[in-house]
């Protein structure tokens, strides 16, 4: 009986417990297509910090040497920054206790003073670019390297420049862990983390943080580490992130973080590096193939008969070497109306110059569309290809414009606005601008510093439709004439009104 029960129980299969949810989907380990797919998501140091150098180098190469990579960087720069973002001071007159007219008069004076500094090359420590040129340089560096830096410097005033503030732009690869002393090394094999022996702070990819993880300093080298063409030794300087007495930033880091505890930015082209490189290789291969196929080549061949070829008979009689060419090509010419008599048994054949790779455009277009989708730049805008209908082209431009506006917000917040605030502090301190209560209350200071930043406008496909839309936005109170003038034409409304009155 026991044996029978044992056999009966053996026949009963115990149901295998199955997890629910993603266990049978994206997290399945039994699905054949996912068995070998086991990536790991780690922290900032392993996922980003350890790969930054490689990502920067490859991104820089694609931005310089591949047409699509160059287009992605330049198109974003052109539409986000363009010739430069202009400041429109907007003091919050309700908080400041002044009238709207007084606020407008103050804004006009501040803008004129700011342009005195910003439009001069004296604002650059190297005296090479004005602020608006530096915006483009900083933004391109941020896209290529993942982040870029600006250091506030000071120089004495001159009769033509009443401000001491100067800016020094620094490429992202110059901010790195110091390698001048073994005391900075922590044993990290990736080189991501180092240690400041003076205070025990950790240094992650050149960014020094305290025990709370707050940024306290940046380590900046005097040249790119590993620079082959140089007469200097590479040294590092510790630049405190904020002033000790004023808490004013000493360094601006322009980056777009996507993860908590991320201290360095990821290059803009990082998600599409492999695809861009493959498109470049495929394009080069097709170009080489097309060039080769464009050549018109002729081959002289000999006819083979039952008694052998012409060379066989000549070789048997000891007349000629069978390895010699069939004919002397210098005796024949190609040209219109030209007749050439060939020896018996000799024929002429040409190489087929047709291009059999008819799928190149379709395949490459699909790959570039994927690149554009990953970068939030529609294919039509990225490749400047507006062959679709008006509605489709406008939809592509509007979608791209949302991306550019978002990046402009980031850039203005990280770069332009902090520079404006530091400049305004000096302007108020030296008496060139009056702002009562500026240094007494942070809320009052913030109200004086409030400003909008406008840059290049969206391309207009149908001016009539866009103007009608602008008019309706103003009439319904969802926008202002000043904003519409700035966003549609990049001009100042008050200057337009004054010029129109003069022209009448």
Q: What is each PLM-predicted segment?
A:
Residues 244-396:
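Extended, charged amphipathic alpha-helical segments
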Residues 131, 136-230:
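Extended, Lys/Arg-enriched charged tracts that mediate electrostatic binding to polyanionic substrates
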Residues 460-504:
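Charged substrate- and nucleic-acid-binding regions of tRNA-handling and nucleotidyl-transfer enzymes
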Residues 222-244:
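Short, surface-exposed, low-complexity cationic segments
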Residues 129-130, 152-155, 290-298, 382-386, ...:
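Short coil/turn segments at secondary-structure boundaries
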Residues 1-145, 152-165:
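Extended, helix-rich architectural segments
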Residues 213, 371, 484:
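Acidic/polar, glycine-anchored loop/turn motif associated with catalytic or activation segments
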Residues 104, 125-127, 336-461, 488-494, ...:
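Surface-exposed loop-to-helix/strand elements on domain peripheries
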């Amino acid at each position: 009986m026991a044996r029978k029960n044992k056999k009966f129980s053996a026949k009963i299969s115990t149901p295998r417990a199955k997890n629910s949810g993603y266990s049978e989907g994206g997290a399945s380990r039994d699905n054949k297509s996912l068995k070998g797919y086991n990536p790991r998501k780690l922290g900032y140091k392993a996922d980003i910090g350890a790969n930054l150098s490689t990502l920067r180098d490859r991104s820089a190469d694609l931005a310089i040497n591949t047409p699509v990579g160059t287009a992605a960087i330049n198109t974003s720069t052109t539409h986000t920054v363009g010739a430069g973002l202009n400041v429109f001071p907007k003091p919050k007159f309700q908080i400041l206790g002044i009238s709207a007219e007084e606020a407008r008069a103050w804004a006009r004076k501040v803008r004129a003073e700011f342009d005195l500094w910003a439009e001069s090359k004296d604002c650059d420590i190297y005296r090479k670019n004005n602020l608006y040129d530096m915006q483009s340089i900083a933004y391109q560096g941020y896209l290529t390297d993942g982040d870029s830096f600006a250091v506030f410097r000071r120089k004495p005033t001159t009769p033509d420049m009443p401000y001491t503030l100067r800016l020094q732009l620094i490429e992202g690869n110059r901010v790195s862990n110091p390698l001048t002393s073994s005391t900075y090394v922590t044993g990290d094999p990736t080189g991501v983390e180092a240690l400041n022996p003076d205070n025990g702070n950790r240094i992650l990819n050149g960014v020094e943080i305290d025990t709370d993880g707050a940024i306290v300093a940046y380590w900046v080298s005097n040249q790119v580490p590993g620079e082959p063409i140089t007469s200097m030794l590479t040294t590092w300087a510790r630049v405190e992130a904020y002033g000790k007495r004023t808490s004013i930033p000493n360094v601006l880091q322009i980056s777009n973080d996507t993860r908590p505890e991320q201290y360095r930015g990821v290059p803009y082209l990082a998600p599409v590096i492999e695809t861009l490189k493959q498109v470049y290789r495929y394009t080069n291969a097709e170009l080489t193939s097309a060039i080769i196929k464009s050549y018109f080549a002729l081959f002289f061949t000999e006819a083979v008969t039952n008694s052998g070829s012409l060379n066989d008979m000549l070789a048997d009689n000891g007349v000629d070497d069978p390895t010699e060419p069939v004919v002397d090509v210098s005796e024949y010419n190609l040209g219109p109306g030209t007749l050439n008599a060939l020896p018996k048994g000799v024929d002429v054949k040409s190489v087929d110059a047709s291009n059999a790779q008819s799928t190149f455009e379709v395949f490459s277009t699909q790959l570039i569309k994927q690149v554009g989708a990953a970068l939030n730049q529609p294919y039509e805008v990225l490749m400047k290809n507006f062959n679709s209908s008006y509605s489709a082209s406008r939809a592509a431009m509007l979608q791209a414009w949302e991306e550019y506006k978002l990046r402009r917000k980031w850039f203005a917040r990280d770069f332009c606005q902090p520079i404006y605030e530091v400049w305004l502090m000096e302007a108020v301190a030296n008496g060139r601008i009056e702002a009562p209560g500026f240094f007494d209350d942070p809320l009052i200071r913030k109200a004086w510093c409030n400003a909008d930043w406008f840059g290049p406008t969206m391309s207009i496909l149908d001016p009539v439709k866009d103007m009608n839309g602008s008019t309706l936005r103003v009439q319904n109170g969802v926008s202002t004439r000043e904003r519409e003038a700035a966003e549609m034409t990049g001009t100042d409304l008050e200057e337009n009104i004054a010029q129109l009155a003069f022209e009448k």
